Amino acid sequence: MESAIAEGGASRFSASSGGGGSRGAPQHYPKTAGNSEFLGKTPGQNAQKWIPARSTRRDDNSAANNSANEKERHDAIFRKVRGILNKLTPEKFDKLCLELLNVGVESKLILKGVILLIVDKALEEPKYSSLYAQLCLRLAEDAPNFDGPAAEGQPGQKQSTTFRRLLISKLQDEFENRTRNVDVYDKRENPLLPEEEEQRAIAKIKMLGNIKFIGELGKLDLIHESILHKCIKTLLEKKKRVQLKDMGEDLECLCQIMRTVGPRLDHERAKSLMDQYFARMCSLMLSKELPARIRFLLQDTVELREHHWVPRKAFLDNGPKTINQIRQDAVKDLGVFIPAPMAQGRSDFFLEGPFMPPRMKMDRDPLGGLADMFGQMPGSGIGTGPGVIQDRFSPTMGRHRSNQLFNGHGGHIMPPTQSQFGEMGGKFMKSQGLSQLYHNQSQGLLSQLQGQSKDMPPRFSKKGQLNADEISLRPAQSFLMNKNQVPKLQPQITMIPPSAQPPRTQTPPLGQTPQLGLKTNPPLIQEKPAKTSKKPPPSKEELLKLTEAVVTDYLNSGNANDAVSGVREMRAPKHFLPEMLSKVIILSLDRSDEDKEKASSLISLLKQEGIATSDNFMQAFLNVLEQCPKLEVDIPLVKSYLAQFAARAIISELVSISELAQPLESGTHFPLFLLCLQQLAKLQDREWLTELFQQSKVNMQKMLPEIDQNKDRMLEILEGKGLSFLFPLLKLEKELLKQIKLDPSPQTIYKWIKDNISPKLHVDKGFVNILMTSFLQYISSEVSPPSDETDSSSAPSKEQLEQEKQLLLSFKPVMQKFLHDHVDLQVSALYALQVHCYNSSFPKGMLLRFFVHFYDMEIIEEEAFLAWKEDITQEFPGKGKALFQVNQWLTWLETAEEEESEEEAD
């Protein structure tokens, strides 16, 4: 990752001064004393002031006391922040976010400490990265900004704040030093001690956790997409003096970031980049120099993309869950129903069902921390073995509504279990004929549980009982820890098959004391659901008729609420929604413009109500487009009417321009896309449309038929449709070259540019490309007129070379005016030169000559040349041949720059 990742500065602070860890880990707070990076060297209003030597001892003591009080206050704040982070769960997220914002973030110093604690927690608990990323998103929006008002950034880009700048700076520091802590142990010649193995495992978790955290922040747009690409390039590129076998850590980080944020990066505009990344990964995957584990990681990542980023089942559910989700998973995976706490106000005496509610405690001791999450576990008692203390209710009490120990009511008590009395107890129960009760149900449940246990993780099939004191709501410190050290807080859950449990009876056997064993799960009693006469779902034909009736009534009456209610009552399945929206569009096509607008409003309203989605609309829109040949027989202007629907959908933010453009590329349904833009300009205004279109990054040439995909033809088509205002630079290209030919003096050219081109475009890459192309075309036409039949493979004469140099020198002031201190614009100028040489079939030595002239005349800086070399975009043709011609010169430039920097360092 390059310096661009730290958008707001290069401040750093030590990763060792934070911490997070799981509950029970030793508390380490950000130190303020003796940490020059964290406090002493921090510039700004909180920096320590110089005190003159003549100050009195009293002043010194007062300053020392104030400093000590300040440090104590900071430590208290950081302790509070750590406590909040330890309690962070999906359910308490909003509440704890507010608490965190109110801890007293009054200075940049405190904000740095908060960021340090959050990042360390995210690195130590990678499973919760998404939760900490959401927390960072909230803080980036709501935390105080100490940088003052920021300059306007690019449209659609998140505003840079102090929190975001410091967060990115911290992550950059972690990224650049990602393998440092792991390499310390890998370079040891002697075998590692158990403590060192554990420290190495923790360091590796943090390394991968940082990469995953960067990916999660990228999903939320807190880290720009270009930064994510720089991370990937850094991890993937071949380092100098580094063998392939030593790239294992970087490639593991690469696989982690691809799994996390790969789906977001893999879109149409970045497809060529992603293809290059994965081509490189495929080649590395076949290399025998890499360890087998790394090769398999690469293979898994490549296959993940081939399967459209749909992960295997093992990776689907790997994030933080709410308590309700945990209960549902217990029912689905373990076959155990864990009841939620009952609502207040319901009569406990009349409860029905296999389990009593946890709020009916009857002087019982609580289960502890687990009771808050799962409610009271059924069938639990106090003590073990014979003579245990009976619980005040049995799981079947709600059904029989009586218990010998409940309010003095006479009732029935459970018999002793087989597990309590061992083999003899089991034989005694069989002799009484009790084991036949519920035999069929038990056998069915047993086979079901045995089938489920095959897919059950090993930790759930171990022997042992559920102990509330052994439950931890957070994962173990590390899944890579020393295997000999079993974490103390490891949860253990044992499934007891129904066949091992006693049958229920209403009276105990003669001579036996009623007892209840500890931690035995009762059998599941499946009640037959009450028979209800459900109507079968409506058929497709019925749904279409209902849709037609609702839409016709709405278009006639204009009552949108009734229409939405009618759609709800249809209870249409999700897969039918696109067809329903298609029907809405088609029914309004042959009606008035007012009715078409009503239909568009109805679709937008269905989206707002959560009934339909943007994808549903796009599917419906494309369905209608496929029917256009048939519809055009009765409705000749059907494409214009559909353009109105698309335009209104964009205005109401139902879809974006880029989403609409994607299925219409390469001239599909041409000129529908241009008709949509016309309608947008008509319904809104040109400036609004121009800004929206530029934000969409749609390539207009790709929207035309393949035969028309060139600049001249595109300008001609856009002028015919009245849309040339979207591309002011296209007209500029022809007019600027005419102006240069008319008067090539730099003063005249600069004045013409100022008078005719908006200042906003002066820093636009497209403008720089056109400016350089115009200069190069003029120089080529003057040095080698078109009438001359010169061979591009022959070298130019001395006079031509001198004339070329003088013309370039005359344009130098104009070039420097627009390129100075703008490396990105200088790279665009080099691409303009590359394309000019490509269009001229690469005349002998031309590219190298201009590279040398640009360097000697200080038009282009060294950094821009090297950035052009490393850039792998395929937007401009001829890059491969261009690199071949100037590669030796670029190598010289790179080594010269390194030698110069070494001399400066000496």
From Swiss-Prot:
Annotated positions of the N-acetylmethionine modification: M1
Domain MIF4G: start-end pairs: 78-308
Protein modification: Phosphorylation; hyperphosphorylated during mitosis.
Coiled coil region boundaries: none
BP terms from Gene Ontology: regulation of translational initiation
Residues annotated with Phosphoserine modification: S11, S394, S442, S901
Sequence ranges of Polar residues compositional bias: 502-515
Region ranges (Disordered): 1-71, 497-540
Positions of the MI domain: 542-665
Stored InterPro entries: ARM-type_fold, Initiation_fac_eIF4g_MI, MIF4G-like_typ-3, W2_domain
Pfam family, one: MA3
Domain of life: Eukaryota
Keywords on record: Acetylation, Initiation factor, Isopeptide bond, Methylation, Phosphoprotein, Protein biosynthesis, Repressor, Translation regulation, Ubl conjugation
Cross-link (Glycyl lysine isopeptide (Lys-Gly) (interchain with G-Cter in SUMO2)): K574
Sites of N6-methyllysine modification: K430
A GO molecular function held by the record: RNA binding
W2 domain: residues covered: 719-903
GO cellular component: cytoplasm; eukaryotic translation initiation factor 4F complex; postsynaptic density
Family to which the UniProt record says this protein belongs: Belongs to the eukaryotic initiation factor 4G family.
Function: Appears to play a role in the switch from cap-dependent to IRES-mediated translation during mitosis, apoptosis and viral infection. Cleaved by some caspases and viral proteases.
Note: This gene has been shown to be extensively edited in the liver of APOBEC1 transgenic animals. Its aberrant editing could contribute to the potent oncogenesis induced by overexpression of APOBEC1. The aberrant edited sequence, called NAT1, is likely to be a fundamental translational repressor.
Name this polypeptide is given: Eukaryotic translation initiation factor 4 gamma 2
Species assigned in the record: Mus musculus (Mouse)
Taxonomic lineage of the native organism: Eukaryota, Metazoa, Chordata, Craniata, Vertebrata
Gene: Eif4g2
